[in-house]
């Protein structure tokens, strides 16, 4: 991921909050999609998880605790999750699935094919819960493939395509926060595409 926290610049309290959101997202990915889904955990979706949980704090029940996991088998770690965390868990798996499918189609990468096969059922479940978002992922990747096939050098159009995808994903509920979330997602998506 590209949205990485500056841990040195975070207070101990902020570091703890970030880590609990990261671990909460990992835990929910595992609960919804199993251990294989945990490989889709990313800093980018952790950022979205923190953003959405902060915006909707108090509107949805939050859960927290201390648990051990495969990465931390000895000492338990603090985790925190809420409804937006499940949303981010589904998006994480779906994004990795469609990205792996894209790599298979472009490069015939066997690892990508294997990984996408592992995520087939999980992505189908995520697509049932979030059809608008999963359709946007598919449409964006198809449009990006068209740009690549045409040899497009229009960075604004190409990055704007990925920005539009991120705007759709950031717009969790299509509610009062939609304009701000879409703007953040769009501009962040353009930036991420240009970095990549």
Where do the language-model regions lie?
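Membrane-embedded alpha-helical segments that form the functional core of polytopic membrane enzymes
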Residues: 184-188
